[in-house]
Amino acid sequence: MTQKDAAFHIERLLKFALKKGLIEELDVIPSRNALMDLFKIEKPYEGEVPEEELDTPSPILNKLLDYGVEIGLIEDTVTYRDLMDARIMGLLMPRESEVVRKFNEIASKDGIEKATEYFYELSKASNYIRMDRTSQNLYWRTPTEYGALEITINLSKPEKDPKEIEKAKKIPQSGYPKCLLCIENVGFAGNLNHPARQNLRIIPVKVAGEQWYFQYSPYVYYNEHCILLHEEHIPMKISEKTFVRLFDFIDQFPHYFMGSNADLPIVGGSILVHEHFQGGRHTFPMEEAPIEEYFIHPKYKEVKAGILKWPMSVIRLSSKDREKLTKLSSHILNVWKGYSDESVDVLAYSEKDGKIVPHNTITPIARFNKEGEYEIDLVLRNNRTTDKYPYGIFHPHEELHHIKKENIGLIEVMGLAVLPGRLKFELEEIRKILTGKEKFNKDMYDENHPLYKHLHWIEELIVKYGTHCTEEEAENYIKQEVGNKFLQVLLDAGVFKRDEKGKKAFEKFMETAGFKKLS
């Protein structure tokens, strides 16, 4: 690629940035100069630049990255290309203060919904949300007795090259930023161990009298998947304050739900070291789940309460009275934290090395329901392990690890499976077996083979469906069976099982918390 070609792609990118509102007319010349400096280009392209309708800058960025490789600016690996494309887009971004000013102006003039729309579009146009990757994720819905569960196979996090992994290990850790959620990520250039964030912008939001910040997730597992993060690097903690914060947020952003991962290992999310919530604009299967048993608490008669028909153990509370809802949520949390019932393997505490270890916590999700009431789902969690279940008693059991072994966090709890990218290839190979394109003999697979972990499952599928399916049949069967596995994952994670014994144990807990069952 010549310098002239690269200069042409810079003009395309400037047009894109102008069209998407990243820059204004007065910014074109300085932005051009900054990009020319980055790529060591001596003069701009002077020919005609055709009009384009692009949703993302990726097609243009890929050309400029190729040029960067050619001139020795970067190595040709996924990580170096990612570091460079964030750097390129960082040169086209409005400053943090400008974004916040515009967000607040739109919110006061046209309402918060329009403001989040602006910010979401900005996050996509800046390539912070890599829509070219997230659009590759596989997605389907699987009907079950609990409604249609949502399944995604996550292809948006590219695999790192083994050489890069080795190289990254040798880089000294600076400890700055402390984690991926710290506010110091805004504008950070990144390195082999930490993604570049020159194209990240965040919006300050006050909740519970504290300073928090609002941004979108770069991986958008669902529509307008957002993150609310504490200004300080403090660990996750579920307490009464959590409920105040969640309700404060939805008061300001009523079109979004907001939830928190649990604050204990195994049942929590992947980042426990930084207090944060996740929300967005998506109706999850759990939200549509009906209440199967109604309860009332004599001290909180203004609050409707019930147990959800859901594979995990969920108490739903709703009320117009936010204060009462907060107090009752806090009461349930405190009772649950100290609650044990050995008959169903629930122990609130254990002792390790002379220290008391807590096991019970909650995954809370707040929203406004269709009646305009505050609504909160409290998902009861327990992270105890035993010799029989070293990964967790209420965690996907080992026979499901071939599909999902990671923590069951907030997103999965609500009925959306985020499954590892390796499954795309593995499920395609299994489909070939069900259609007869590949012969199956379990002795063909040693433990290093990608299908080895699925052998027992493949045998079950062959018994059930045979090896003469059409392509379409095989695909549908596999999707249904993966959905069934995810349902089993959620059932494993539920503390009170869905059988008679589990239902009675759940009712006993509700009684302990002071609830009366409504017949």
From Swiss-Prot:
SS bond list: none
Organism in which the protein naturally occurs: Caldanaerobacter subterraneus subsp. tengcongensis (strain DSM 15242 / JCM 11007 / NBRC 100824 / MB4)
Keyword Glycoprotein carried by entry: no
Pathway: Carbohydrate metabolism; galactose metabolism
EC number, as in UniProt: 2.7.7.12
GO molecular function: UDP-glucose:hexose-1-phosphate uridylyltransferase activity
Organismal lineage: Bacteria, Bacillati, Bacillota, Clostridia, Thermoanaerobacterales
Official protein name in the record: Galactose-1-phosphate uridylyltransferase
UniProt-listed InterPro entries: GalP_uridyl_Trfase_II (IPR000766), GalP_uridyl_Trfase_II_CS (IPR023425), GalP_Utransf_C (IPR005850), GalP_Utransf_N (IPR005849)
Annotated family: Belongs to the galactose-1-phosphate uridylyltransferase type 2 family.
Keywords: Carbohydrate metabolism, Cytoplasm, Galactose metabolism, Nucleotidyltransferase, Transferase
Source taxon at top rank: Bacteria
Compartments, as annotated in UniProt: Cytoplasm
One Pfam family per UniProt: GalP_UDP_tr_C
GO CC term (a single one): cytoplasm
PROSITE patterns reported in the protein's UniProt record: GAL_P_UDP_TRANSF_II
GO aspect biological process, one term: galactose metabolic process
Reactions catalysed: alpha-D-galactose 1-phosphate + UDP-alpha-D-glucose = alpha-D-glucose 1-phosphate + UDP-alpha-D-galactose
